[in-house]
UniProtKB/Swiss-Prot annotation:
Function of the molecule: Probable thiol-disulfide oxidoreductase that may play a role in proper chloroplast development.
Protein name, UniProt field: Thioredoxin-like protein CITRX, chloroplastic
Transit peptide: 1-36
Lineage: Eukaryota, Viridiplantae, Streptophyta, Embryophyta, Tracheophyta
Residues at the site labelled Deprotonates C-terminal active site Cys: D106
S-S bonds: C112-C115
GO terms for cellular component: chloroplast; thylakoid
Length: 189
């Protein structure tokens, strides 16, 4: 009875995803207000995973009907979005190649709650800056070596590359407001 009462106090996004299954909070977790996922912990007891009651943020897949399951991988692939997922080789070509617009790279993981939240903002910015910036994303689970080489320690991590290759890239880590991303694109690059 106490478990049902505790589950009713959780936000709607923390409700059980399977019918008939009771919500069971993790015993060894300590609630945290962090909005980033530590890259080395794979979501165990960090950030929204703890707040939402488990190692993985529950309810991450917003529209399961629109996604395709990849057998054997345990992953769902979303339909095409404006922000293209790139490989290490493709990213290297984009960074080293000549661009007339800034390049924004989102390092994310499918199990990272803050990454899912930021992905929505990144998609909106891709529409807003359609001809004035290029947005791409890198799945750190698929491109582990690249993430390590780029020193991605927490998720989400954004890199901002100026079209002027003499300027250093800017980096942010964790969930940041959409206005801060706009400010970096408009004023820093």
């Amino acid at each position: 009875m106490a478990m049902a009462a505790a589950a009713s106090l959780l936000p709607a996004c923390a409700a059980p995803t399977l019918p008939g299954r009771a919500f069971r909070p993790r015993r060894n977790s300590t609630p945290t207000a962090s909005l980033s996922c530590d890259g080395g912990s794979r979501g165990r007891g960090v950030g929204l995973g703890v707040i939402l009651g488990g190692g993985r943020a529950q309810g991450v897949r917003r529209n399961a009907a629109a996604e395709t399951y990849v057998p054997g991988s345990g992953k769902y692939i979303a339909p095409d979005y404006l922000v293209k997922k790139v490989t290490a080789k493709e990213l290297e070509e984009l960074v080293r190649g000549e661009r007339k617009v800034p390049l924004i790279v989102d390092f994310y993981a499918t199990w990272c709650g803050p990454c899912v939240l930021m992905a929505q903002d990144i998609e909106m910015l891709a529409v807003e800056y359609e001809n004035n910036a290029l947005f791409v994303k890198v799945d750190t689970d698929d491109e582990y070596e690249l993430a390590r080489d780029m020193q991605v320690r927490g998720l989400p991590t954004l890199y901002f590359f100026s079209p002027d290759q003499s300027k250093d890239a800017l980096r942010t880590e964790g969930l940041i407001p959409i206005d801060m991303i706009r400010n970096i694109i408009d004023n820093e690059l």
